[in-house]
């Protein structure tokens, strides 16, 4: 068939995958420069892909999964992607966003929540149209088939959790039933908490995905922290 565009399909890069440089960010930039230089004279649109964290991108506040893949390596400057590249499609971060206000350098975002920290993220895809006139970019929003929910929003004692479960809608579990995370503040030993939760959920139109049993964590000042961010998962 006829070649109409080139794609720089770059996976997540580990040390040794990119040219030798003073740091990770510069090494990744050198690799993209080399790849783009190989095809830029052919007069066809170029699409770049990458699995990385770009400088200026936004990370979900409570979502640790967006940090673990990078493993502490430096962010990559958007300058790594030449202005002449028609579109740069990035992955790793789950929130749909432009990078440094560049319309054609984007994280499309996940089509559905990948964790309970993403319950408020807007879902959708980005449709790209590349022609002789330029690059057209359109965000297509949609509702996921099934959402995610956390009760309570912050960990609470078991009795309060059971009351919150009682307020959930009754019905059969279907493909549209939300995935449920339950957060319990364990102020005292409660060996039967899982059984009590499972019993309370019978007949509820939700799908239990996770029970996070948490202990209050004392700070050096002696104050007991009760917010979700400061709780230690058992």
Regions found by a protein language model. Give the residues of each.
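Broad gene-expression machinery/nucleic-acid interaction feature
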Residues: 4-7, 125, 179
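Short C-terminal domain-edge/linker segments immediately following a structured domain
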Residues: 37-38, 77-84, 104, 118-122, ...
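Short amphipathic alpha-helical surface micro-motifs
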Residues: 30-32, 71, 87-89, 107-110, ...
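His/Asp/Glu-rich metal-coordinating catalytic cores
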Residues: 1-104
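Accessory, non-catalytic peripheral segments of nucleic-acid enzymes
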Residues: 130-234
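Residue-level detector of secondary-structure boundary/capping sites
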Residues: 23-26, 119, 188
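Gly/Ser/Thr-rich active-site loops/lids in small-molecule metabolic enzymes
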Residues: 71-75, 114-116, 205-209
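A conserved active-site cap/scaffold subdomain adjacent to cofactor or substrate pockets
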Residues: 78-152
């Amino acid at each position: 068939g006829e070649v109409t565009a080139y794609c720089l399909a770059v996976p997540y890069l580990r040390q040794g995958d990119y040219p030798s440089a003073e740091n990770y960010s510069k090494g990744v930039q050198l690799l993209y420069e080399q790849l783009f230089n190989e095809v830029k004279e052919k007069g066809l649109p170029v699409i770049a892909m990458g699995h990385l964290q770009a400088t200026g991108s936004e990370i979900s506040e409570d979502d640790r999964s967006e940090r673990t893949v990078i493993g502490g390596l430096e962010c990559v400057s958007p300058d790594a992607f030449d202005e002449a590249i028609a579109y740069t499609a990035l992955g790793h971060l789950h929130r749909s966003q432009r990078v440094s206000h560049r319309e054609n350098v984007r994280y499309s975002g996940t089509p559905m929540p990948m964790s309970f920290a993403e319950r408020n993220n807007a879902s959708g895809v980005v449709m790209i149209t590349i022609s002789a006139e330029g690059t057209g970019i359109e965000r297509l929003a949609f509702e996921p088939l099934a959402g995610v929910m956390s009760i309570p929003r912050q960990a609470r004692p078991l009795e309060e959790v059971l009351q919150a479960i009682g307020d959930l809608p009754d019905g059969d579990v279907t493909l549209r039933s939300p995935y449920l995370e339950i957060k319990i503040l364990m102020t005292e030993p409660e060996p039967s908490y899982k059984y009590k939760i499972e019993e309370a959920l019978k007949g509820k139109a939700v799908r239990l995905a996770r029970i996070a049993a948490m202990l209050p964590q004392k700070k050096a000042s002696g104050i007991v922290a009760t917010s979700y961010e400061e709780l230690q998962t058992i």
